[in-house]
Amino acid sequence: MSELDILAQYLKDHNIPFERYDCDKRYGISWDGIKLDDEYTFYMDRHQICVPSQQYRLWDVICQEGSYGYRDGLLEAYGDIVEVDDAVEGYLTAQDIIERIEKHQYSMDSISAWLLSKMQNETEIGSNENLDRE
């Protein structure tokens, strides 16, 4: 069981909303969009959990080529769960993330309140933009 699997199971067991993305793809597209031969393709192994969702992300963790800890099967985190603002933290285990979840007391209720606040703020901004256009 991977670190991401352990974290996903914890989130499910504690009713914390999340979306998980797993992407195992071979890419053969060059920068100019021309299809390359098989010898120039590369493999993208990307796994991500977003809390509560991709669109409204309070925090997320990834394990993909190039992320801090990927080669060791460890997680990289970004967002509200990290110790330093606007930074990523790597080489984390699922247990490291779980301890932070418990420290911040994330729950369905707290995340729902955050999400509602975020959506209301976007609605207010959209209303103000419409007033500016009139």
Regions found by a protein language model. Name each.
Residues 1, 13-14, 43, 121-122, ...:
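Intrinsic low-complexity, intrinsically disordered segments enriched in polar/basic residues
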Residues 15, 23-26, 32, 83, ...:
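Short linear sequence elements within intrinsically disordered, low-complexity coil regions
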Residues 9, 19-21, 32, 37, ...:
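Compositionally biased, intrinsically disordered low-complexity segments
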Residues 18-74:
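Amphipathic, interaction-prone secondary-structure segments
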Residues 5, 31, 35-36, 69-72, ...:
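Polar low-complexity intrinsically disordered regions enriched in Ser/Thr and small residues
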Residues 3-17:
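Amphipathic alpha-helical segments
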